[in-house]
């Protein structure tokens, strides 16, 4: 008669035979432990054990013990406690120890495609979905002894490689960017992995925008700098856009002939004709012309203030100046504010008004309109016209409130190399074809090309396929040169266009992606609160309200989810240290699953 007893504390086994012989601490044949993959591993022998021996004198014989019952396969709820993986018995776990358990294999089913890896591989990243036993428990199928995920199969090659390589994330070539990014979010690889993935794919990392430390300055800065931050910020943005549009419309209307003539008459009214004054003798007897009693100097400044265009311009400049000063005093960094191109445009948009106003005031000074200063006045008028032209740059102020203009500006900035190559190719073509058409038309008396520099204009409008027709070749040789010039221009312009379009698409999708992420963060119950996205993009609740009882692909009932959720929420703290409670919850899930199948 032979009775096999359970394992001893030193790792060996004990067998009691009917003949009075016993083997303590080990058996003749080393016991084997079944692994999760079906292989066998010899258990370590006890310390100081021999093959078979009788009871020595003075040694206390062991009392008889009941035979060891066969251990059933453990539930995943016991495994999630950190004591083993589904499919590993208690005796096997005690025999193998933590080191062997670390190398146990786990089966992952991705939409019918099975992957096999080790628990230690997944445990490298415990904060992820697959690395955290509590998170991946929701997807365990106890009947098939595997984890099932209804996700994109090709993407899991890159996800599994992330665990196997220790953190290197590589997107499979047959998976699109948005699909793989969605898988990264589902498996909860973290923000750091997402940022590395975006950098590897060529995405530019967005710099964090600083905010003022003072609460009042922060609120003012958000209102005037970020129109989407609040309702008041949107109202300020609408007012700013309206003022910009009014300023641009006024700038265009004041150049119409009817308005221009009226303004000139208002600013410089005609002086009534006065008869010539009689010469009078001065104190020294010299003749001098006495001023007429009725002649007066036209009050230019009051008449300028009465101009409706000047009033509208003054109102717009007051708003622009107020907005610029408020943003300057509320900005977090004065140096960064001064280097910002948009703020430079704001300054350029308002300083022509003050220069014009200063010129008007200078004309009011005595002797400001003397005849000896006609040349200086003409030069000042030319400079003033150029300064007034700068007002047209106010249209770029709209880019502060327009995402489309911002995308266009970023596209041009990113395509400066391609634009430089385009200008360089055009420059070469202009030199080449202007020289060729000049020599081709040199013998013709009626030619339009008197010199090579005169032919530059023709070469530019021909290569850009504009063709004004003011200058054209007459001879056969000149027409051949013109045809080659047009073909070369089309090819030169068409070559860098795809790169520019690609940059535009990149910045456009980047902006839309930012808007989607911002909307995702604003939604209640986002991933920061423990939720995730399933394959269809729908929200999945936290694990206490998720699928607790999926068995054999059957759908759990609402009652089973409710019962399991209540139990887990009620005993959540105890369940982490009470294996019996988790075992009872697992039995509850199996019972509800069987009821659903029936």
UniProtKB/Swiss-Prot annotation:
<feature type="transmembrane region" description="Helical; Name=Segment S6">
    <location>
        <begin position="480"/>
        <end position="508"/>
    </location>
</feature>
<keyword id="KW-0472">Membrane</keyword>
<dbReference type="GO" id="GO:0097623">
    <property type="term" value="P:potassium ion export across plasma membrane"/>
</dbReference>
<dbReference type="GO" id="GO:0086089">
    <property type="term" value="F:voltage-gated potassium channel activity involved in atrial cardiac muscle cell action potential repolarization"/>
</dbReference>
<dbReference type="GO" id="GO:0097110">
    <property type="term" value="F:scaffold protein binding"/>
</dbReference>
<feature type="region of interest" description="S4-S5 linker">
    <location>
        <begin position="403"/>
        <end position="416"/>
    </location>
</feature>
<dbReference type="Pfam" id="PF00520">
    <property type="entry name" value="Ion_trans"/>
</dbReference>
<dbReference type="GO" id="GO:0005886">
    <property type="term" value="C:plasma membrane"/>
</dbReference>
<dbReference type="GO" id="GO:0019229">
    <property type="term" value="P:regulation of vasoconstriction"/>
</dbReference>
<keyword id="KW-0633">Potassium transport</keyword>
<feature type="topological domain" description="Extracellular">
    <location>
        <begin position="439"/>
        <end position="452"/>
    </location>
</feature>
<feature type="topological domain" description="Extracellular">
    <location>
        <begin position="254"/>
        <end position="308"/>
    </location>
</feature>
<dbReference type="GO" id="GO:0086091">
    <property type="term" value="P:regulation of heart rate by cardiac conduction"/>
</dbReference>
<feature type="topological domain" description="Extracellular">
    <location>
        <begin position="363"/>
        <end position="380"/>
    </location>
</feature>
<feature type="region of interest" description="Disordered">
    <location>
        <begin position="517"/>
        <end position="539"/>
    </location>
</feature>
<feature type="region of interest" description="Disordered">
    <location>
        <begin position="1"/>
        <end position="89"/>
    </location>
</feature>
<dbReference type="GO" id="GO:0014704">
    <property type="term" value="C:intercalated disc"/>
</dbReference>
<dbReference type="GO" id="GO:0007219">
    <property type="term" value="P:Notch signaling pathway"/>
</dbReference>
<dbReference type="InterPro" id="IPR027359">
    <property type="entry name" value="Volt_channel_dom_sf"/>
</dbReference>
<feature type="topological domain" description="Cytoplasmic">
    <location>
        <begin position="402"/>
        <end position="416"/>
    </location>
</feature>
<dbReference type="GO" id="GO:0051393">
    <property type="term" value="F:alpha-actinin binding"/>
</dbReference>
<feature type="region of interest" description="Tetramerization domain">
    <location>
        <begin position="1"/>
        <end position="195"/>
    </location>
</feature>
<feature type="cross-link" description="Glycyl lysine isopeptide (Lys-Gly) (interchain with G-Cter in SUMO)">
    <location>
        <position position="521"/>
    </location>
</feature>
<keyword id="KW-1003">Cell membrane</keyword>
<feature type="intramembrane region" description="Helical; Name=Pore helix">
    <location>
        <begin position="453"/>
        <end position="464"/>
    </location>
</feature>
<dbReference type="InterPro" id="IPR004052">
    <property type="entry name" value="K_chnl_volt-dep_Kv1.5"/>
</dbReference>
<dbReference type="InterPro" id="IPR003131">
    <property type="entry name" value="T1-type_BTB"/>
</dbReference>
<feature type="short sequence motif" description="PDZ-binding">
    <location>
        <begin position="596"/>
        <end position="598"/>
    </location>
</feature>
<dbReference type="GO" id="GO:0071805">
    <property type="term" value="P:potassium ion transmembrane transport"/>
</dbReference>
<keyword id="KW-0630">Potassium</keyword>
<dbReference type="GO" id="GO:0009986">
    <property type="term" value="C:cell surface"/>
</dbReference>
<keyword id="KW-0631">Potassium channel</keyword>
<keyword id="KW-0813">Transport</keyword>
<comment type="function">
    <text>Voltage-gated potassium channel that mediates transmembrane potassium transport in excitable membranes. Forms tetrameric potassium-selective channels through which potassium ions pass in accordance with their electrochemical gradient. The channel alternates between opened and closed conformations in response to the voltage difference across the membrane.</text>
</comment>
<feature type="transmembrane region" description="Helical; Name=Segment S2">
    <location>
        <begin position="309"/>
        <end position="330"/>
    </location>
</feature>
<feature type="lipid moiety-binding region" description="S-palmitoyl cysteine">
    <location>
        <position position="331"/>
    </location>
</feature>
<dbReference type="GO" id="GO:0060081">
    <property type="term" value="P:membrane hyperpolarization"/>
</dbReference>
<dbReference type="InterPro" id="IPR028325">
    <property type="entry name" value="VG_K_chnl"/>
</dbReference>
<keyword id="KW-1133">Transmembrane helix</keyword>
<dbReference type="InterPro" id="IPR011333">
    <property type="entry name" value="SKP1/BTB/POZ_sf"/>
</dbReference>
<dbReference type="GO" id="GO:0060372">
    <property type="term" value="P:regulation of atrial cardiac muscle cell membrane repolarization"/>
</dbReference>
<dbReference type="InterPro" id="IPR003972">
    <property type="entry name" value="K_chnl_volt-dep_Kv1"/>
</dbReference>
